[in-house]
Amino acid sequence: MDRPVAAAAAASAASCEGAGGPGPGPGASWRPSRVAGGASASSRHPSIETLDSPTGSHVEWCKQLIAATISSQISGSVTSENVSRDYKALRDGNKLAQMEEAPLFPGESIKAIVKDVIYICPFMGAVSGTLTVTDFKMYFKNVERDPHFVLDVPLGVISRVEKIGAQSHGDNSCGIEIVCKDMRNLRLAYKQEEQRKLGIFENLNKHAFPLSNGQVLFAFNYKEKFPVNGWKVYDPVSEYKRQGLPNESWKISKINSNYEFCDTYPAIIVVPTSVKDDDLSKVAAFRAKGRVPVLSWIHPESQATITRCSQPLVGPNDKRCKEDEKYLQTIMDANAQSHKLTIFDARQNSVADTNKAKGGGYENESAYPNAELIFLEIHNIHVMRESLRKLKEIVYPSIDESHWLSNVDGTHWLEYIRVLLAGAVRIADKIESGKTSVVIHCSDGWDRTSQLTSLAMLMLDSYYRTIKGFEALIEKEWISFGHRFALRVGHGDDNHADADRSPIFLQFIDCVWQMTRQFPSAFEFNELFLITILDHLYSCLFGTFLCNCEQQRIKEDVYTNTISLWSYINSQLDEFSNPFFVNYENHVLYPVASMSHLELWVNYYVRWNPRMRPQMPIHQNLKELLAIKAELQKRVEDLQREMATRTISSSSERGSSPTHSATPVHTSV
């Protein structure tokens, strides 16, 4: 690889936090704030700069993974002296074997090693090297290039593995194509005798899809130690207490403590105080999957609430349930500042009508007095899956520059992001400006409903715009309320054509990224934080996104036998911090949901193309800015102390003269 291409290929995915003005950005409104409510062991992961050492840090490995390059472990900083030394060592077979060896996580084991494998890189051509398959990753390395070339792919990102012809590499060759969930495809070619001897295809299939082969996901074998326990990030009782709950209108209920009331809901829910358990059970019978309206968020002043649920089972004959009607009336009455209730149905009206014919449906306004029903016209999971497929086609491996804008438009991806953001803005505005309580549902209440509640809460509550607040938001609105991560992502499952797969959570994170672009100083986290979350949505390294609901996680011992992603992130917060962050606790954000204000997230969707990445990792520049900021703040504090000391000294010298206190120096850095 020539030097310019190597430099481009080694560039990290950027952290694109723009420098904001004095406020968090356009479209923000003010209201009083609500007060918020908590030595990593070294692993065996060397960076390329430390090839002589058998050890390295987990943090460095993950940074390289997240940096997201087609040759993500290429080291552009190896000196000529080191290169010369390493190339001399190539004559030593033991040294070469050591250099080619894949670094392992605690608990990770090698399953196959294959020499003379060719990686057919769409940007640099064929690269020959050694392929190592472990129970966590596929690791390809070429040590003969300057600098060394490494392709490190967690098996969890693999959607399917297919055999392909490799005639161009010799009649005695065979090949495989690896289709990934993170917007890339990989092609490998190797000798047929290696396939017969080592079963490369079979090994990849077996360990990329452990659940389909009677094995456990690697997260249950991962033994890294972190100084922070990420499982403690979210405690439902503490979070509801932060919101001022329980109160006279709302109670914390443990009716679902054994998951018998609703198996896809969390053990702890918040419901109206006056509602009896018997009536709640009747409401559950009238709601799909028993997902009754429960509180997600309450306004600190107006007491307007966001409640979430599933569709009512009215059916084609407009069936009614007096307990459900009374229940929604109780939700409305809990807000003394409004005599209205707005029901946001995330679905398209036509789709809701189809669901009604099949036994589902939506609230008839004649049966729910003072309730307004609004359809947000968001497409279903199948449309979103197809949209992402089209997007992948235009961004990988090559980009048609002459038709870029029209090709992006043809995927409808940004249009669906716009509709989702627009719906969340309507919800936030109804709560903040209209002081009206809202009920949100789609069909089952775990896809579009989670998108809308979490985005609206992000706009309304500045706590969720902090790192730990955002983690709590994901734990609460997505994980505990039963978004079906296992089905939507397909963890460890070889059924790549499963109709349940859909990029619902990816869309949510994309919407958050769009908000960070419009309000660059309103979020404590940076772009790397969001990319890290998405990378580990697929990786199966952590237990955070495993299973479909809280009950399943308890049954599978996820909380005791796996590590939380937040343990990793919260052990190195400076890596994921936005240096421009200002904690505007009293601001509500209203992002502009217009195509003119939205853009394709190139640093995520197109990060595998070395020609589309910045030459220098922006998140590294932001880290340096944070260090400079801290240094300047320390200097200001030192100067303030010095001025205070001089003032005291001057006052003492004047003796009986009137004392004058120094005016504090308030400096924003």
Curated annotation (Swiss-Prot):
The protein's enzyme class: hydrolase
Binding site for phosphate: 443, 445-448
Domain GRAM positions: 94-165
Residues that bind a 1,2-diacyl-sn-glycero-3-phospho-(1D-myo-inositol-3-phosphate): 355, 380-381, 443-448, 488
Biased composition (Low complexity): 1-17, 649-661
Keywords for the protein's UniProt record, in alphabetical order: Acetylation, Cell membrane, Cytoplasm, Hydrolase, Lipid metabolism, Membrane, Phosphoprotein
Known catalytic reactions: a 1,2-diacyl-sn-glycero-3-phospho-(1D-myo-inositol-3-phosphate) + H2O = a 1,2-diacyl-sn-glycero-3-phospho-(1D-myo-inositol) + phosphate; 1,2-dioctanoyl-sn-glycero-3-phospho-(1-D-myo-inositol-3-phosphate) + H2O = 1,2-dioctanoyl-sn-glycero-3-phospho-(1D-myo-inositol) + phosphate; a 1,2-diacyl-sn-glycero-3-phospho-(1D-myo-inositol-3,5-bisphosphate) + H2O = a 1,2-diacyl-sn-glycero-3-phospho-(1D-myo-inositol-5-phosphate) + phosphate
Protein name: Phosphatidylinositol-3-phosphate phosphatase MTMR1
Organism whose genome encodes this protein: Mus musculus (Mouse)
Lineage of producing organism: Eukaryota, Metazoa, Chordata, Craniata, Vertebrata
Gene: Mtmr1
